[in-house]
């Protein structure tokens, strides 16, 4: 190999010193960011170049002109030519407020949906709801185990383009708000309540109603709903419709709520007056010895059983019936109202 082609290595003759970067080197140059200057210099209150209340619109403009041509003869008239010029320009117009159908995610629509929708959980409650009013279902959540049992429900939702989610038990507990979800939760439209006066306007020869006074416990309400459905009583009078349509009450009812219609009343005392005028026999549960034993009570064709978590003596009138469920009992508080409902409705059923 030729020695001239051999590489030669030379040591560096210069040394470099490490320099520290100060604060001024960390600052971003302003000359390269002109569009940020106004924003960070305290000029936010100045009028924006592009107004937010207006939108940019492409507009076609048509202009007509009349052009004259020089005549060949001075004495002749000047000929004219009509010219149409078409151009496209940009204009800013005020945004028009949308008046059509609201988007499903619009705040007004969300607020309305929350007022009209509720959640139902529990296997029996959800399956009974699907059997009676499947069109009211908006969305479904279910665990993997439950999804194997509700294939018909999932097929219906898929055919009608309604959403359903297969989630784990923890996620379902967060969605439903309880650990007692039973593996399934539905978002549904609330059932519509009817007015008591509208119900009484239709004459009936035979009827049985249950009136709830001061009943707020979801376990008690659910038990009464299930008992009424079991004995074929289809109407309940109440002044707290929201309590009857709560998710906890419907879970305890285990599907019985789907067979019950709520008759809404403004006040319980006025509702009892309306029922008396319509010819209904009002029956209260009595814990006093002055009450009539249940086996001695004669039921009329139109009956209203008044149930309460407390005493209903203040609502009773002399024409009402006070029924005793036992002749002697060491328990002064009596039975649960769901049990009272079962005893009274059984007598009505086998009258």
UniProtKB/Swiss-Prot annotation:
Keywords on record: Methyltransferase, Transferase
UniProt superkingdom: Bacteria
SMART domains: SpoU_sub_bind
EC number: 2.1.1.-
Organism: Haemophilus influenzae (strain ATCC 51907 / DSM 11121 / KW20 / Rd)
One protein family per Pfam: SpoU_methylase
Signal peptide positions (record): none
Positions of region (Disordered): 1-61
GO cellular component: cytosol
InterPro entries hit by this protein: Alpha/beta_knot_MTases, Ribosomal_eL30-like_sf, rRNA_MeTrfase_TrmH, SpoU_MeTrfase, SpoU_subst-bd, tRNA_m1G_MTases_N, YfiF_prd
GO biological process, one term: RNA processing
Gene3D superfamilies named in the record: 3.30.1330.30, 3.40.1280.10
Family (UniProt): Belongs to the class IV-like SAM-binding methyltransferase superfamily. RNA methyltransferase TrmH family.
Listed SUPFAM superfamilies: alpha/beta knot, L30e-like
UniProt GO MF annotations: RNA binding; RNA methyltransferase activity
Biased composition (Basic and acidic residues): 16-38, 44-61
Primary enzyme class: transferase
Name of this protein: Uncharacterized tRNA/rRNA methyltransferase HI_0424
